[in-house]
């Protein structure tokens, strides 16, 4: 299935739904150079856990995931 990932640019990924959020972060890192530990992946504004698969998160075909950077400081 196709999945859209919006980071600094919009990317189209071909996925099965069995990929983990951590794998998506690694892919975004290779595309945009943002370290996975500095990424927050959001679905409808809610952050997704790294260990969860896309299917477990409710990601369906043609869904858009947002990738935000972590805020520095505390």
Curated annotation (Swiss-Prot):
PROSITE patterns in the cross-refs: UBIQUITIN_1 (PS00299), UBIQUITIN_2 (PS50053)
SMART domains with a match to the protein in the record: UBQ
Superkingdom to which the source organism belongs: Eukaryota
Segments forming a coiled coil: none
Record's miscellaneous remark: This protein is synthesized with ribosomal S30 as its C-terminal extension.
Family, as annotated: Belongs to the ubiquitin family.
Protein name: Ubiquitin-like protein FUBI
The organism of origin for this protein: Pongo abelii (Sumatran orangutan)
